[in-house]
Amino acid sequence: MNKRSLIVVLLTLSSLLLCSPTVTHAQWEPDVRLTVAPDSSCTGYNNAWSIAASGDSVHVVWFDKRDGDGEIYYKASTDRGTTWTADTRLTNDMAFSGWPAIHLSGLQINVAWEDQRELNPEIFYMRSTNGGATWEPFSRLSYAYGVSTSPCLSMTDSIVHVVWSDDRSGNSEIWYRRSLDGGAYWEPDTSLTNAPGNSEFPSIGVSGTNLHVAWADYRQGNTAEIYYKRSTDRGTTWGPDIRLTNYDSVNSYYPSLAVRDSDVHIVWRNDQRRLGIYYIRSTDGGDSWSPASRITDTLGYTFRPSIAVLGSNVHLVWMDDRLNCNPYFDIYYKCSTNRGNLWGPDTRLTYDPSFSWYPSIAVSGTKVHVVWTDHRDGNYEVYYKRNPTGNPSSIEEKAEALGQRVDVMHKLVPNPFVSFATIPGHHSELFILYDISGHRVGTYRGERIGEGLKAGVYFLRAEGGGAKPVRIVKVR
């Protein structure tokens, strides 16, 4: 066996060990209560995310009723979840605002939610372009005069993409809207489905120019199936609806979708054998799909899966009542370190005899971050938990660290730059910038390197080390 083959074997074994029940349980830190409110605080639906993370920063959104009707709130951590800012109220009206979704791209934070200030529920949007320090005024995205709900959003290359479901046509359909300038101006909305049954709970992921959407659909009759469609031109045109499940007599519902390069991962709840979490993936950008498989190991009820991916690692959380404490649920977790080929065992994250609902997951560097809604304090509050070493580096990344490195930073364009630069093919990866004295100035995704910096000379390297730093210049 040559040296490189031995390295790969050892790294494979170490990655699998990191997802073993003993190791993963030991690495998870204690639960942290994020909200202290006199009324209910709640995270959002699982088709979207209530938490986002990049580098040292972690961002959380939720809604709560401390002010009466329900408002959207936000808070952040700049030290990887160790300490947290005070709550920031994002909405202020006399009607219900709830079920928020968040997405992070560099220093820009995008939030969408369901809002009833126009009497019927509509989709609203708000952004921060400076990491949450300040927030711009809201934008109304839907004008359905029916029920618009369950938004999910993503962003890449200054394009913000939002999907949701609304019933303006008589039954719920999936709608899409995009902004080409980072959320300042929005193009008209577009219906992605036109089916005889309801289409609900869309989940969107973006990789480069490719958009991927999954949702639950009742067009086949009284039971829901998981459907998928994609755009390969940033949302300008869309391919056909593709049915991914075929269970007929049982529901497939509550999908959650994550994308990494050409890998598309989808999980959902299935009613077969009570309620299990099922998984399907495509490794060619949606051209073909693996068989669907059940990946939870329980006869209890499982709901609301949330999925995240970074490198070769796929992470999953869900709510679970396998301990027969119905109606109480616990939050469970599992991961795959090889792009979804094999999955580690189920890991229990919460141990309080109360309701733990609506989990959401994010990954940054080696850290896995989870938030959920919890009733242990007598009313619903938002709780947080992290695993500081829960995202092991991929085999490829570790092999590069041992000598087989690829210096992708030399592809950065333009250089010098005025606003920001990009690294083609590495838009979602994280890179660290240092000033000329060697001080770290920030972490950026490959799609918006250097945004918000003053003019000057900087040095760029991939998060986690590896390739030699690259000199970059920002002008004006």
Question: Where are the regions that the model predicts?
Answer:
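Bacterial N-terminal signal peptides that target proteins for export
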Residues: M1-L10
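Extracellular, repeat-based ectodomains that mediate carbohydrate processing or recognition
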Residues: H25-P392
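Local alpha-helix boundary/kink/capping signal
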Residues: L18, T83, T134, F420-T422
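Composition-driven detection of intrinsically disordered, low-complexity segments
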Residues: V8-V9, N246, R386, L402-R405
